[in-house]
UniProtKB/Swiss-Prot annotation:
Pfam families associated with the record: RNA_pol_Rpb2_1, RNA_pol_Rpb2_2, RNA_pol_Rpb2_3, RNA_pol_Rpb2_45, RNA_pol_Rpb2_6, RNA_pol_Rpb2_7
Family matches, as HAMAP family: RNApol_bact_RpoB
Source organism of this protein record: Corynebacterium kroppenstedtii (strain DSM 44385 / JCM 11950 / CIP 105744 / CCUG 35717)
Chain's role: DNA-dependent RNA polymerase catalyzes the transcription of DNA into RNA using the four ribonucleoside triphosphates as substrates.
Domain of life: Bacteria
Taxonomic lineage from the root: Bacteria, Bacillati, Actinomycetota, Actinomycetes, Mycobacteriales
Identification of the protein by name: DNA-directed RNA polymerase subunit beta
UniProt similarity note: Belongs to the RNA polymerase beta chain family.
Gene that encodes the chain: rpoB
Amino acid sequence: MLEGPILAVSRQTSLTSGIPGATKRYSFAKIKEPIEVPGLLDLQRDSFAWLIGAPEWRAKKQAESEEGARITSGLEDILEELSPIEDYSGNMSLTLSEPRFDDVKNTIDEAKDKDINYSAPLYVTAEFTNAMSGEIKSQTVFIGDFPMMTDKGTFIINGTERVIVSQLVRSPGVYFDESIDKSTERPLHSVKVIPSRGAWLEFDIDKRDTVGVRIDRKRRQPVTVLLKALGLSTQDITDRFGFSELMMSTLEHDGVANTDEALLEIYRKQRPGESPTRDSAQALLDNSFFNPKRYDLAKVGRYKVNRKLGLGGGSTTGEHTLTEEDILTTIEYLVRLHAGERTMESPDGTELMIATDDIDHFGNRRLRTVGELVQNQVRVGLSRMERVVRERMTTQDAESITPTSLINVRPVSAAIREFFGTSQLSQFMDQNNSLSGLTHKRRLSALGPGGLSRERAGLDVRDVHASHYGRMCPIETPEGPNIGLIGSLASYARVNPFGFIETPYRRVENGQATDVVDYLTADEEDRHIVAQANTKMDSEGRFVEDTVEVRMKGGNVEVVPASEVDYMDVSPRQMVSVATAMIPFLEHDDANRALMGANMQRQAVPLLRNEAPFVGTGMELRAAHDAGDVVIARRSGVVETVCADFITTLGDDGQRDTFLLRKFERTNQGTCYNQKPLVEAGDRIEEGQALADGPGTENGEMALGRNLLVAFMPWEGHNYEDAIILNQRIVEEDVLTSIHIEEHEIDARDTKLGPEEITRDIPNASEDILADLDERGIVRIGADVRDGDILVGKVTPKGETELTPEERLLRAIFGEKAREVRDTSMKVPHGETGKVIGVRVFSREDDDDLAPGVNQMVRVYVAQKRKIQDGDKLSGRHGNKGVVGKILPAEDMPFLPDGTPVDVILNTHGVPRRMNIGQVLELHLGMLAKSGWKVDPESQDPAIKAMLETLPEDLYDVPADSRVATPVFDGTTNEELSGLMRSSRPNRDGDQMVNEFGKSTLIDGRTGEPFQQPISVGYMYMLKLHHLVDEKIHARSTGPYSMITQQPLGGKAQFGGQRFGEMEVWAMQAYGAAYTLQELLTIKSDDVVGRVKVYEAIVKGDNIPDPGIPESFKVLLKELQSLCLNVEVLSADGTPVDLGADDDDLDQANASLGINLSRDERFDADAV
């Protein structure tokens, strides 16, 4: 059942660094990495495969586990947990088991087109047992359509691609805390037992040295009351806690003599106002902590409790509810902690370290991945269904009951639908480019249901923690209110079955690094001594030096003998995320700027022609392959057919594969998704080779921007404050041109007055306006359109009015044709232009699935080619962002001695105070990659001799126009850069364009004179960001007004006006511009009568009349009158002013001019 496209996910092979057909990159890396970066989408794929129990997941688990071990999927776990559902008498029961899926209903493309879910039907086996008659009835029950994950780790919900973000939450377990009492300055200790589901149990020691307990955050009571309620006698408590004066003192003053009194006391505190009985008190306590239906520690909670308290040998098995031993050991641990003891004997007889817990440590925070989040929703739905089943068992005739008659699947499907559609963790996928999609799927969020809220989250939880190392990136996080609450999974990290993030380390034995790699959680890592990846080693992996810099518990760096080291990092980039690992010379950038660089790479728009960076980090290839936008060969073989739409390959095993390419599709962010073939018919291909490029990739490598020739210099003040000066060539040759696609949708509905109609027959529309519409009234593909042009003609019936004799005659002659309709056509929104590239028509007549009341729906796709222009935002990869301030003709740009004009001029002031020196080093290395270099190993130059100590041999001779890689924390050194600049290849004239410092004497394009000082020139990778001026610039003539205040609306989306605010008014007052100020406050704003009279005066050529009373003044009066204040307006001579007197004039003026300027916000901006 689970074959086919449901889990195309699991069939993807893991990619190695030796990807066939890839562009050669000359890498400066010195460190050999023992393992590859794991699959970058495994976080999503593996979790969902566990949830649905995919065959590949089962096979993998069986291979890893002991023979005969039972393997259950996420859905099977829930059904086991829920079953059996018994009626109140226990005579009838219903058991659910064996969840299974049919094939998916629609393909991914069909789901997107029809605005439906990409899902598969879920069935379970339901077995009803009647204990009285011994009868068993079994049926297969349809539970609902279950959204399935695509091969890219996304979901298609209502036609849009969404991502379920993994949630970082506090793990269930037992947590000890220390606080300082403000009055006595003594340390006070407390402990919380936090379950996955159920009531919290808290113990604390207060300043009066009594041990108390809070159940479910209610009132505090002596801990011995709880112990007696659990059935312990005073003697039992004395035997267990006789060593503690605190416990003995608490026992003495607890005021209860036996178990019954203790139970009643707890009931009174928990349920004040209710009369307690012993049975109800016992039931309350049992349900709170010992009933699996009400209280659940989960596997991870039991694991954490056992590890912390030394129970069960630290195993993961055991009850998922609390046990008496759990409670006793927790109290003992607390009193010993308060007494200042450092160790205690655990119930297992082992020695247990006593310490408080750090709640921000990654040993105490775990991930809820997509599988667990969906599983929790299914659990919620099933528990609602359970109540319905119980009720039906009692109301239906026992003889006629069948499983299908008991089960109502609506609560389950509703819970799943609600989660995927509206949950804070189900997010509209960021498809701006390949990297943004990949990063979105690897995002970790501490927000969401059961997590933190940004208002309550303090600095501690947002801060970088030592345990984040190799697990969560310390760089990549948003800049706004979510800073530190949303992170990104580190490149080598993976998630273990308990949800804790693990990172790999090389095992070190007797000072020698082996190739054995262990994945450690943050807790396990704290028990070991870990060396850095760049620790100096000989060819056999032995540490060269006797002492090594290592990381100890808490992130402290110390120097220890080499023989004491347990592990070392597998790679220098294991601490950062994928996006951060793509910043060359990251080690030379300030963290704040690196954060901006990592975030802004995700905002880069795919360009018309993509170009991989000259200076990369080696991560570009792997990121592009794993993002899923590059088409990859499934098996080795030969290319049979290549065209723009598909590629066919014939494998060596005789199997034929067809790869459909996606052409000019719109992404969620309006960028263009287009795939282009890289191979030709007859080419030999290998498994894993890139067959076609996606958006923002070149030859299978991530390519988000262009390599441009950059000079660092001020230029006439035009690049002041991060402004950027561009060469006109960039515009003319479409170097930074991108395609943006907008989708416009309109539907024809049934209205009370009759059906709307999509038609070419539009009232009062000339043939010129209709020229590009076809006979159906829909714009033709290929038409160039601009704002205000009709895309789809539509008429809506008007309300019938009294007909004139002439109209009655027309109605009699032409029948219904002359009926009153109004034009409700879909027009191109204000400020948009482009070319129509696609039209989709959905009609009820063609059996398309449309919403109720909709007869026809039309989607029109308009593509726009946007060249770079003044006001667009550009950025490098080091947080060096800026706005295009001026585009100069190529002849005015400064040029190199060989006549090459520079493409970009950046201001030097943007470097020193921001401390992102990486951009300057990238500039120099980019120039070297462009020119190539040849190193003379025999050279006596000190700079070259220093370089040869570290430079890999395969980098001695590099041709021009090469691609280089400088991995983060393991890249080009300053000595290497300095030596290579002395070894760069001359151009064809035999000249070297830059000197040994990477500088060149530039010549002013306007005067032909050289600039006074040499200037740093080189190639930098520049990105065009999504903040385009075309989408921001806006101007209003007349438009919609707010219904209450009658002032113009604000914002481009509402076709609003520019707010002339309080501070601007002060400026007018300062200049004494009284008349301008009066106009702004009245006829240009909310003087409803005045603005119509002004229009009339302009039309008739009269003088502008005096302003009237602003509407907001009338609103203020009404507000005061609503507070029972009798406010009247008096004229200068003391006579009352009638504020409604002008309304009649207004109506007459409107009628005579045939205008309506008093629009309200219900009017659509497009209709203006």
